[in-house]
Amino acid sequence: DAPCSGEGMNYKHDKNTNYRDPKLAQGFSNLQYQILRSGVLATKVWGEIVYSTCTLNPLENEQVIWKILKEFEGAVELSNVEIDEKSPGLMQYWDENLLSQEDAQKVARFWPHKQKTGGFFIAKLKKLSSLPYTTQYDKRKKEKIWLNDSFELQSQVWNYLLENRG
């Protein structure tokens, strides 16, 4: 259950459903993507990950799944969420394509007015193959870093440290 804007719960608790903060939703979307990405990297081959939110916002749901499927194409796939009376995911949001028709049928979306519950979203991913894991450290190791080993620079650093750090 990823941190989310909680927009789906507003309907359940009769809160103001007209207020939506796009910046907040985009911030959550970025965080959710990073969390799910870390989960994909940490999951063993043939392992499954269940992703869920209590929001109706496609930026926090289908878009996150779309980005993961795109980044890890061929190594991760959607599995069918087998829940009765679920609604399919969204294939498009405004002018942005999200999920294919096949993938939209695999995820579960729950609408307050249809399922008489708070709004939420569920997707199930399966990892099909191992992935290369790179860190910022790995990227830096590949780049040549030229060090200035001149006595003058060393002397300047030493003097600065003595004066400012004791």
Segments (PLM) and residue ranges:
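S-adenosylmethionine
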Residues: D1-G166
